[in-house]
Curated annotation (Swiss-Prot):
This is Sodium/potassium-transporting ATPase subunit alpha-1. It comes from the Eukaryota. The lineage of its organism: Eukaryota, Metazoa, Chordata, Craniata, Vertebrata. Its EC number is 7.2.2.13. It comes from Xenopus laevis. Residues 84-86 are annotated as: Interaction with phosphoinositide-3 kinase. The chain crosses the membrane at residues 90-110, 134-154, 291-310, 323-340, 775-794, 805-825, 846-868, 921-940, 954-972, 988-1008. Keywords: ATP-binding, Cell membrane, Ion transport, Magnesium, Membrane, Metal-binding, Nucleotide-binding, Phosphoprotein, Potassium, Potassium transport, Sodium, Sodium transport, Sodium/potassium transport, Translocase, Transmembrane, Transmembrane helix, Transport. Residues 111-133, 311-322, 795-804, 869-920, 973-987 are extracellular. GO terms for molecular function: ATP binding; ATP hydrolysis activity; metal ion binding; P-type sodium:potassium-exchanging transporter activity. It is an enzyme of class 7 (translocase). Belongs to the cation transport ATPase (P-type) (TC 3.A.3) family. Type IIC subfamily. The sodium/potassium-transporting ATPase is composed of a catalytic alpha subunit, an auxiliary non-catalytic beta subunit and an additional regulatory subunit. It is found in: Cell membrane, Sarcolemma.
Length: 1025
């Protein structure tokens, strides 16, 4: 689109809101403002005559405002700048990480631990420090992971900051008859401003005089061609009329004078920026999922805690003991390691995506992309290459195809015809575009050009086919030129002819094909000039319609050899009082151009379709062009017709076709303006392939909201300022890193560093993968909760010595389980990842009943059995047989009782009993590690067999070894008996849990086999999470 990095110098981007999306005040006033902004731009200034303008603004059309008056207005209206969006102070961002969602659960756990320790300290003379340790560790976990997440987002913010090139803008104003260059912020309402090619328009201007002035409106309206600006009132719609130049667009060529009619936030651009910053972005799907998950876990924890609190009172424990149990059970239910796991998983994916050219601004957006069900994509630069390229030529009465591929591997045409020589000469000479200096070694297609998009395309095409255009221009020196203007719609130049066998001067002309043809009486065929008859005019008309129907921009070319007798050497050509012929010329041919699709896009759109994602094109461009590109990239697939296509095929009027018969539809912005919400919903519901053309920024927003009403999770791509409201409103906004404006980058959640649509599909795959892998990590982490909680419950109910201590639970959650849980984030995708429909956020949750039933009810129970088996084996080896343990707890824990008898009549002192108890804690811990081996392996897949998936995940294999080594270290390292009360085990005790590990593996393989054999059956419904 625009002209490279020179765009967007001073958008409200100096301060920006990274991280979470902004929340909207609930006030009615805010909603009213939003509705105001959603309306189309209203403006009357373009309809006023110069006298009325003078009366309204008090501006002298020659001398401008007086300096004193300008100062008054500046004091009244404030500076001409956009209000920066409210920013979040760094400390607030940090607190959000520390106290958001999951962290709160751990904070509550920590407070409960300190509370329990306080109660124990008040009750006992020598209280155990377990709860104190636990509280400290939990607090540390939250603080460390909070710092980690904050650092991650701060890093993205830094990259964002580097996008901003804040250069103070200058403007040329006329005040009291003198030209002054002032800071653009000091421009006021009614100022007389002068702009020239290369300037940024400093405010909304009503043009009062112009000379060949063209502006690049692409960042505002999405039109890729520069638009002419003149004093004429040409359209009721202020965005379409020629006499208004908009703030922050670029003047590409020519000069103009205008009166400032809006400044700062009141400009059209300012309204859009306000619209974007005022929108409520909403919570990300993953944030909603994690909240849902916290609800489940908290629910389970509180339910168990309260149940056992009541039970312990019934079993005649004291109130204080019951409170300690309540707190213990709630804390044991909290998966301490999960917060870190989720953060690390999202970070890893964000890093992986950055390598694939997707910069993720806030971590949660990674997953949102995976649940996307609709992508509203901009056309220019995202689906297309963002460079006009010659696509076809028509000469010698036939259409030739040019090569539009990025690496020139496509079609070639016959370059030997003398007509092509003539056509290429006209296209090269009647052309003001030039290559910028110092690019001799750059490939021709990659070179930067000074000139408008169409001329650049011609220049590159001729340079590729015929060699140096510069040499051609030097040989055929230009002696006169009439630049293109909107009234006569042609560009003409006269050159000295380098060919001695032809006339001394040659006139070359290009322009709108029908205008050029009207000026011609002859045509070149096979190098010979022939009269232009009706048959050839029909052939021209057919070719013109065919190329135009492909959505291409067509130009006509003609020339005339000026006779030597009338135009001797040194003849003075006058371009004002034209003293040379501009009629009866000789037509040479047509050349058509298009911004061609990127090579990887059709494949990417196909992938989206098989992944159940609907791709909608939303563009400011012409409907015919939009439809042609949509067909080219597969957004409208082969064989699918629009209402117009059906009408043409059946030869009936469009209004007789039933819209439901057409799968595809192309909707014009002006039609969209008059539609009700119901009509928009109807279109989105009944058409699978949709293109919106000639849309305004406000309409883009309406389209996004329409999709969201259908329950879709919407991703929006865009690069212009005009896209920012939609980017903000969408579930995930994707801005372009190269062509994108600062406002759009700021509104987006993700930035495509290579501007390529295909990168989005990679992102979708990564997003789905992270969701799958998070599920696997959570399933793995939650499973060990059961063998951690059940010992506590049995301890209360059966009055046996405590099988597993608090410190050992921490060693599992924050020690042995951490690396394996994170390693699941590296798991490769299962085969169906891009073949299934997008997940439904309402029904397909991150943690659902089936996952809880698998983790808690099935695998977790087997694990608990393994732990208790080990516990009973060790106690039995020490003389306490299982049935003698019932009800022994009170004596066992009494430090003054030193004569507790075992099954063989031996007496045990308090110290000896405790050593056996702590050895049991260690063995229970080791047995959980052993059964978690199997759990980790079965969590690798949800449907495939582990044998199909293979053990390619090196991190996971490392995780298996790491957790085993850590467990052995904690058990055998000298000094652990004092620090963590962990004691060395006999080697045979490691093997007690092996059979249970095997049972878990076999049980799950059989379950997955049944799911694969009978898809949709009972087992899948009950256990496929």
């Amino acid at each position: 689109m625009g002209y490279g990095a020179g765009r967007d110098k001073y958008e409200p981007a100096a301060t920006s809101e990274q991280g979470g999306k902004k929340k909207k005040g609930k006030g009615k006033g805010k909603e009213k403002d939003m509705d105001e902004l959603k309306k189309e731009v209203t403006m009357e200034d373009h309809k006023l005559s110069l006298d009325e303008l003078h009366r309204k603004f008090g501006t002298d059309m020659q001398r401008g405002l007086t300096t004193a008056r300008a100062a008054e207005i500046l004091a009244r209206d404030g500076p001409n700048a956009l209000t920066p969006p409210p920013t979040t102070p760094e400390w607030v961002k940090f607190c959000r990480q520390l106290f958001g969602g999951f962290s709160m659960l751990l904070w509550i756990g920590a407070i409960l631990c300190f509370l329990a320790y306080g109660i124990q300290a008040a009750m006992e003379e020598e209280p155990q420090n377990d709860n104190l340790y636990l509280g400290v560790v939990l607090s540390a976990v939250v603080i460390i992971t909070g710092c980690f997440s904050y650092y991650q987002e701060a890093k993205s913010s830094k990259i964002m900051e580097s996008f901003k090139n804040m250069v103070p803008q200058q403007a040329l104003v006329i005040r009291s008859g003198e030209k002054l260059s002032i800071n653009a912020e000091e421009v006021v309402l009614g100022d007389l401003v002068e702009v020239k090619g290369g300037d940024r328009i400093p405010a909304d201007l009503r043009v009062i005089s112009s000379h060949g002035c063209k502006v690049d409106n692409s960042s505002l309206t999405g039109e890729s061609e520069p638009q002419t600006r003149s004093p004429d009132f040409t359209n009721e719609n202020p965005l379409e009329t020629r006499n208004i130049a908009f703030f922050s667009t670029n003047c590409v060529e020519g000069t103009a004078r205008g009166i400032v009619v809006n400044t700062g936030d009141r400009t059209v651009m300012g309204r859009i920026a306000t619209l974007a910053s005022g929108l409520d972005g909403g919570r990300t799907p993953i944030a909603i999922e994690i909240e849902h998950f916290i609800h489940i876990i908290t629910g389970v924890a509180v339910f168990l805690g309260v149940s056992f609190f009541i039970l312990s009172l019934i079993l005649q424990y004291t109130w204080l003991e019951a409170v300690i149990f309540l707190i213990g059970i709630i804390v044991a239910n909290v998966p301490e390691g999960l917060l870190a796991t989720v953060t690390v998983c999202l970070t890893l994916t964000a890093k992986r995506m950055a390598r694939k050219n997707c910069l993720v601004k806030n971590l949660e957006a990674v997953e949102t992309l995976g649940s996307t069900s609709t992508i509203c994509s901009d056309k220019t630069g995202t689906l297309t290459q963002n460079r006009m390229t010659v696509a076809h030529m028509w000469f010698d009465n036939q259409i030739h195809e040019a090569d539009t591929t990025e690496n020139q591997s496509g079609a070639s045409f016959d370059k030997s015809s003398p007509t092509w020589t003539a056509l290429s000469r006209v296209a090269g000479l009647c052309n003001r575009a030039v290559f910028q200096a110092g690019q001799e070694n750059t490939p021709i297609l990659k070179r930067d050009v000074a000139g408008d998009a169409s001329e650049s395309a011609l220049l590159k095409c001729i340079e590729l086919c015929c060699g140096s255009v510069r040499d051609m221009r030097e040989k055929n020196h230009k002696v006169a030129e009439i630049p293109f203007n909107s009234t006569n719609k042609y560009q003409l130049s006269v050159h000295k002819n380098a060919n001695p066998s032809e006339s001394r001067y040659i006139l070359v002309m290009k322009g709108a094909p029908e205008r050029i043809l009207d000026r011609c009486t002859s045509i070149i065929l096979q190098g010979k000039e022939q009269p232009l008859d009706e048959e050839l005019k029909d052939a021209f008309q057919n070719a013109y319609l065919e190329l135009g129907g492909l959505g291409e921009r067509v130009l006509g070319f003609c020339h005339l050899a000026l006779p030597d007798d009338q135009f001797p050497d040194g003849f003075q050509f006058d371009t004002e009082e034209v003293n040379f012929p501009t009629e009866n010329l000789c037509f040479v041919g047509l050349i058509s151009m298009i911004d061609p699709p990127r090579a990887a896009v059709p494949d990417a759109v196909g992938k989206c379709r098989s992944a159940g994602i609907k791709v909608i094109m939303v563009t400011g461009d012409h409907p015919i062009t939009a439809k042609a590109i949509a067909k080219g990239v597969g957004i409208i697939s082969e064989g699918n017709e629009t209402v117009e296509d059906i009408a043409a095929r059946l030869n009936i009027p469009v209004n007789q076709v039933n819209p439901r018969d057409a799968k595809a539809c192309v909707i014009h912005g002006t039609d969209l303006k008059d539609m009700t919400e119901e009509q928009i919903d109807d279109i989105l519901r009944h058409h699978t392939e949709i293109v919106f053309a000639r849309t305004s920024p406000q309409q883009k927003l309406i389209i996004v909201e329409g999709c969201q009403r259908q329950g879709a999770i919407v991703a929006v791509t865009g690069d212009g300022v005009n896209d920012s409201p939609a980017l903000k409103k969408a579930d995930i906004g994707i801005a372009m890193g190269i062509a994108g404006s600062d406002v759009s980058k700021q509104a987006a959640d993700m930035i495509l560093l290579d501007d390529n649509f295909a990168s989005i599909v990679t992102g979708v795959e990564e997003g789905r993968l992270i969701f799958d892998n998070l599920k696997k990590s959570i399933a793995y982490t939650l499973t060990s909760n059961i063998p951690e909680i059940t010992p506590f419950l049995i301890f209360i109910i059966a009055n046996i010595p405590l099988p597993l201590g608090t410190v050992t639970i921490l060693c599992i959650d924050l020690g042995t389980d951490m690396v394996p849980a994170i390693s699941l984030a590296y798991e490769q995708a299962e085969s169906d990842i891009m073949k299934r429909q997008p997940r439904n956020p309402k029904t397909d949750k991150l943690v659902n009943e089936r996952l809880i039933s698998m983790a808690y009810g099935q695998i977790g129970m087997i694990q608990a059995l393994g732990g208790f088996f080990t516990y009973f084996v060790i106690l039995a080896e020490n003389g306490f047989l299982p049935w003698t343990l019932l009800g022994i707890r009170v004596n066992w824990d009494d430090r003054w009782t030193n004569d507790v008898e075992d099954s063989y009549g031996q007496q045990w002192t308090y110290e000896q009993r405790k050593i056996v108890e702590f050895t049991c804690h260690t063995s229970f811990f080791i047995s959980i590690v052993v059964v978690q081996w199997a759990d980790l392996i079965i969590c690798k897949t949800r449907r495939n067999s582990v044998f199909q998936q293979g053990m390619k995940n090196k991190i996971l294999i490392f995780g298996l070894f790491e957790e085993t080594a850590l467990a052995a270290f904690l058990s055998y390292c000298p000094g652990m008996d004092v620090a963590l009360r962990m004691y060395p085990l006999k080697p045979t005790w490691w093997f007690c849990a092996f059979p249970y590990s095997l049972i878990i593996f076999i049980y799950d393989e059989v379950r997955k086999l049944i799911i694969r054999r009978s898809p949709g059956g009972w087992v899948e419904k009950e256990s496929y999470y």
